[in-house]
C-alpha cells in the first residue's frame, strides 16, 4: 500500500522532489502544503507558488494556510491522516502540535551537509565561505532549527564557477532521489536516524538585499565568491555614480583572458579599456562581465560603460 504523504514546499527547487514522489508508485501525495499566493511582477498580482502550480496541474489538493500552526489547520491536517509529511523549502517554522500529526513525522530535505549551514540560505553560505564540498541531508524535523536526527546524505562538489542557482539546481535533483529513498526506508523500517553531531554547527540565515551589496574593500577572491553566492537571488549590486547596478559573476585576474589594468586599483576604483571593465578590491581587481542597469536587461559591461560615458573618477560603492 502506498505511503500517504503531504508534501510541503514552495519555490522552484522543491519541484524535482515533488515530481519524484508524484511519479512513484510507493507514494501517494494526498495534498500539497505551500505558502499563500504572493505578489509577483510589476503589477503585484498574487500568484501561486511553483509548487502550488505543479500540484494544481496534477489535480492535487493545495493547502495555503496563512497560519500553518493554528489549531484550525492542525485539525485540518489531522483529518487528512497522512502517514508522513515531506518538506522541501516550505518557508515556515512548524510547531509541536503540527509536528505530532503524522505518525512517521515530518521529513525535511535540507541543502547542506548538516550540521553545517543550518538555516534559510545553506547553498549561498557554502559558496561564500569557499567550501568545495556540500550536499543534501534528510532529517526528521524537531522544534529547534534544522537540528533533528539524520536519515541520509548525498554529497555534491562545488565547482569554481558555480552560482547559487546552478548549485541549487543540481542539489534539487540529487536531493529528490535522496528524499524518495529516505521515505522508502522509513516505510520499510530499514532506516534508523542518527543524532546530528554537536561539532561543526554553522548557521546560514537568509541573505537580505542590503547584504548582497558588493563590498569592494574585501579581497578579490572573497568578492568573487560572494557575488556568485547571491546569484541569481537576491542578486549582487553596487552603486556607480547615482545608479544602482546589478552585477553578474565577475572574473578574477588570473581567470581572465584579458590583461588586468597596468596600475593597481584602490577598492571601488573603475578602469575601462577597449575590451574590459575592472573594479579594484582590497587585493587584485576583478573584471565585470554582465551588468544590469536600472530598468534594463543584463548586458555586456563594456557596452554599458561605453554608452554610459563614465567619469574617469567614477567609483563603485
Swiss-Prot record:
Q: Which reaction does it catalyse?
A: L-methionyl-tRNA(fMet) + (6R)-10-formyltetrahydrofolate = N-formyl-L-methionyl-tRNA(fMet) + (6S)-5,6,7,8-tetrahydrofolate + H(+)
Cysteine-cysteine disulfides: none
Q: Which SUPFAM superfamilies match?
A: FMT C-terminal domain-like, Formyltransferase
Print the keywords alphabetically.
Protein biosynthesis, Transferase
Cite the EC number: 2.1.2.9
- Asked whether the UniProt record includes Calcium among its keywords, one would answer no
In this chain, (6S)-5,6,7,8-tetrahydrofolate is annotated as bound at 112-115
Q: Gene Ontology cellular component?
A: cytosol
Molecular function (GO) terms for this protein are:
methionyl-tRNA formyltransferase activity
Its function? Attaches a formyl group to the free amino group of methionyl-tRNA(fMet). The formyl group appears to play a dual role in the initiator identity of N-formylmethionyl-tRNA by promoting its recognition by IF2 and preventing the misappropriation of this tRNA by the elongation apparatus.
Write out the similarity annotation. Answer: Belongs to the Fmt family.
From the Swiss-Prot or TrEMBL record, give the protein name. Answer: Methionyl-tRNA formyltransferase
Amino acid at each position: 500500500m502506498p505511503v500517504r504523504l503531504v508534501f510541503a514546499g514552495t519555490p522552484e527547487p522543491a519541484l524535482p522532489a515533488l515530481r519524484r514522489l508524484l511519479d512513484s508508485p510507493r507514494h501517494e501525495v494526498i495534498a500539497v502544503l505551500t505558502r499563500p499566493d504572493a505578489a509577483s511582477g510589476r503589477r503585484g498580482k498574487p500568484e501561486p507558488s511553483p509548487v502550488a502550480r505543479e500540484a494544481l496541474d496534477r489535480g492535487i489538493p493545495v493547502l495555503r494556510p496563512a497560519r500553518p500552526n493554528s489549531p484550525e489547520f492542525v485539525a485540518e491536517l489531522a483529518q487528512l491522516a497522512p502517514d508522513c509529511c515531506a518538506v522541501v523549502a516550505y518557508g515556515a517554522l512548524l510547531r509541536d502540535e503540527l509536528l505530532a500529526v503524522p505518525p512517521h513525522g515530518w521529513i525535511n530535505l535540507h541543502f547542506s551537509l548538516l550540521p553545517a549551514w543550518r538555516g534559510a540560505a545553506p547553498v549561498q553560505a557554502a559558496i561564500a565561505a569557499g567550501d568545495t564540498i556540500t550536499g543534501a541531508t534528510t532529517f526528521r524535523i524537531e522544534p529547534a532549527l534544522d537540528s533533528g536526527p539524520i536519515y541520509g546524505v548525498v554529497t555534491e562538489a562545488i565547482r569554481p564557477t558555480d552560482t547559487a542557482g546552478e548549485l541549487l539546481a543540481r542539489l534539487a535533483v540529487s536531493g529528490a532521489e535522496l528524499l524518495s529513498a529516505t521515505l522508502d526506508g522509513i516505510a520499510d523500517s530499514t532506516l534508523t536516524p542518527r543524532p546530528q553531531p554537536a561539532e561543526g554547527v554553522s548557521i546560514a540565515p537568509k541573505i537580505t538585499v542590503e547584504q548582497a551589496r558588493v563590498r569592494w574593500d574585501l579581497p578579490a577572491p572573497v568578492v568573487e565568491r560572494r557575488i556568485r553566492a547571491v546569484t541569481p537571488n537576491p542578486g549582487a549590486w553596487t552603486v556607480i555614480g547615482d545608479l544602482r547596478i546589478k552585477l553578474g559573476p565577475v572574473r578574477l585576474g588570473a581567470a581572465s583572458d584579458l590583461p588586468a589594468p597596468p596600475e593597481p586599483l584602490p577598492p571601488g576604483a573603475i578602469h575601462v579599456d577597449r575590451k574590459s571593465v575592472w573594479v579594484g578590491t582590497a587585493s587584485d581587481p576583478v573584471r565585470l562581465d554582465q551588468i544590469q542597469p536600472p530598468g534594463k536587461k543584463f548586458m555586456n559591461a563594456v557596452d554599458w560603460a561605453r554608452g554610459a560615458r563614465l567619469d574617469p573618477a567614477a567609483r563603485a560603492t
